[in-house]
């Protein structure tokens, strides 16, 4: 029963393997106060995951991809280039180019110390977390690799613009029950929220035929632009 053949309506066949069945529903189905409350739990879970990375035996070689500026914005960026997203105007490209430059600069200053950069999930959005009301379980580790710990927050909130401050505060409250962040770390939270949204534009472009890309439209872009404008207004390029 753990090996199944899945046939899609168009005749495409997938051979699927199952390790175990997880009962519950995706956190992404929760709304309002229930979602904010669950965000505290997700913050705790994320911190526990990061502590596993921080305390791991570095003598054990772990070959996983890196999620850094080269992977996000480089010539061979993993998901392609945000500039190729079809809905962008020239004004949008100018805005996000400024954001990219500032993100690169600030990440260079932030650095990759062991308490800031290590093994992360790298795709911890709410439909990759299954909850039965008491127990939360994380799935889909194919993107797991080396990256900035706070990038996992950006992944969790990549599709949310409403109640973003409340969700971020709830995540931080849960996270710091397990692992304290420095003031320098906390100042970087808006950067990682914006970073993931910009990188997702590249994914939407390179996966334009996917169901997800077809359902994401102007609202996502507008919310990303608002975050970008706020980020630039509150920071400056040296």
Predicted regions and their residues:
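All-alpha amphipathic helical-bundle segments outside canonical DNA-binding/catalytic cores
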Residues: 37, 183-193
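Active-site activation/catalytic loop segments of kinase-like enzymes and analogous catalytic loops
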Residues: 149-180, 196-212
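A glycine-centered beta->alpha junction motif in the catalytic cores
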Residues: 18-30, 78-87, 198-214
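Short conserved catalytic/interaction loops centered on acidic-Pro-aromatic/His motifs
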Residues: 55-63, 187
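Active-site catalytic-loop/activation-segment of kinase and kinase-like phosphoryl-transfer enzymes
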Residues: 17, 63-109
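ATP/Mg2+ or Mg2+-diphosphate-binding catalytic cores
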Residues: 200-238
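ATP-binding pocket architecture of kinase catalytic cores
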Residues: 1-58
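Active-site acidic catalytic loop and adjacent metal/ATP-binding pocket
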Residues: 101-150
């Amino acid at each position: 029963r753990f090996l199944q053949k899945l046939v899609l309506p168009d005749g495409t066949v997938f051979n699927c393997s199952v390790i175990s069945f997880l009962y519950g529903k995706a956190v992404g189905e929760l709304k309002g106060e229930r979602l904010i409350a669950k965000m505290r739990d997700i913050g705790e879970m994320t911190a526990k995951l990061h502590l596993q990375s921080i305390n791991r035996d570095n003598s054990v070689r772990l070959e996983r991809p890196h999620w850094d500026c080269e992977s996000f914005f480089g010539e061979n960026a993993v998901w392609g280039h945000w500039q190729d997203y079809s809905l962008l105007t020239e004004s949008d490209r100018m805005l996000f180019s400024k954001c990219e430059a500032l993100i690169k600069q600030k990440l260079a200053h932030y650095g990759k110390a062991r308490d800031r950069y290590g093994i992360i999930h790298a795709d911890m959005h709410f439909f990759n977390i299954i909850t039965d009301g008491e127990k939360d379980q994380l799935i889909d580790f194919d993107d797991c690799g080396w990256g900035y710990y706070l990038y996992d927050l950006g992944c969790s909130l990549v599709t949310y613009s409403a109640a973003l401050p409340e969700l971020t505060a709830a995540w931080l409250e849960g996270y710091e029950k397990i692992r304290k962040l420095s003031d320098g770390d906390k100042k970087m939270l808006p950067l990682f929220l914006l970073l993931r949204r910009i990188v997702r534009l590249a994914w939407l472009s390179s996966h334009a035929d996917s169901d997800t890309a077809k359902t994401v439209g102007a609202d996502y872009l507008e919310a990303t632009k608002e975050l970008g404008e706020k980020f630039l207004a509150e920071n400056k390029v040296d």
